[in-house]
Amino acid sequence: MKKRNLVLSVMATCLVSCFLLSGCNGQKQIDSETVKTVKVEEQAHLQDDTVSPACKITIDYSYLAESDAADSIAQRINRTIQAHVLGKEYIRMNPEVAVDSFKNTYINNYRKDVNEFYQEDIKNGTPKDELPTWYNYEYGLTTHFSEGKEGILNFIAETFEYTGGAHPNSWNKWMNFEKNTGKLLALKDVFMAGSEKPMSDMLLEELITEMATRLEDSSITSLEGLQNAGILNSTNMYVPDNFLLEKEKVSFLYNKYDIAPYAVGVITLSLPYKI
């Protein structure tokens, strides 16, 4: 408990010094009221018809409206998000143009990947009801902003994709921005040097509790119990880059396969700023 108190004290002290003071410097700040959205729902078939295999794309993409050409904070945040979520090639585009370009590129790549195989099957007389299911792709992206700890704007992106295989894949991306600068915060910007090991130990404790409850397995009381359940077999516990500075706590996200098998799903662990 002493170690837990110490680490949380370090976290709280660092967070106060990094953010609470920076929010009082009188600079213009971004807030979530400036959020706009781009929505896309499209089904693109391999052929110019309505019966050939198709790629279904659904996008609900949030971005910050720039008040004027000099609104560098909103622009910096938008460009950072576009680079991380859509790809670096979209970084200089207007958000609406970036989403549309991303959609078109995805559809073009789908047709390149699948059309040759589809044409071969049609040429060979394969009945349409016997065509491989993986000829149908699906892509979904949902994003949103939320208010985080004082001076911080949180951003969450949730992606779903099916391109064949035993199951679809999904992953999340969490980001934290300083409202008064638009800077994307990394772990090193938030937590003091030397805190990774004790924080990893604390997260391990939280993981044991979470997995024992989720899997309804009372034998999970230690690292060994986790490993017997297929968790942390290929990596040590670590502090992930996917974290969220929320109002009352800091949360950490482990996507599927990060520390556990696909079947376990996404794992979220939280530590309070104060106890």
Question: Can you say where each PLM-predicted feature lies in the sequence?
Answer:
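Compositionally biased intrinsically disordered regions enriched in Thr/Gly
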Residues: C24-I275
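Bacterial Sec-dependent N-terminal signal peptides
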Residues: M1-T34
